[in-house]
């Protein structure tokens, strides 16, 4: 049987992902694609890893020939920690004087907006879905499902406050209050960073946040987006303006 040369898709994309920015030439623009769910750690293409995406941004701002970063965002969000990790790396690039341009794809919502908010310019298309400025948390419990098949559990503890998060039991009132307070804190932090980054009063941000999603054109009217246009060609043109 005839065969052909081949390589696994995972190995191929890992090779591309790990390729460093060309060290030759000056006045370069680094284009970094952030596509997929935002999660912690090092992730393959198709998922935005807090460590791996931050590393790409770091490689860009540590290259003295790179003058601008275009962050191409196509993400519905993900984890707060990873999103903040990426945002902090972009802030480091800004501190070094690099121009940061966020180019939104089909979706740049929730965590996708979190990592875009501090860009010098945010570009989107008319139909980009963005916003979703909000925080939520989930804790699965299986007490009802287990009860249906006749499996029950019980136990003893030294406190009335149950913080164990036992998935075989209903969510306790104490743990529920703690989770709710963390969600509320995260939400205030989110609208606070958007308010500061976009220079919008925090009360106004709260009105347009609360998990609402907006089309790109509406987001521009609300001040969440700077420009509407081709999110690739126009963004590159504006990035070139900062270099030459």
Name each model feature, range by range.
Residues 206-208:
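Generic long, charged, amphipathic alpha-helical segments
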Residues 76, 210-214, 234:
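Active/binding-pocket-proximal capping segment
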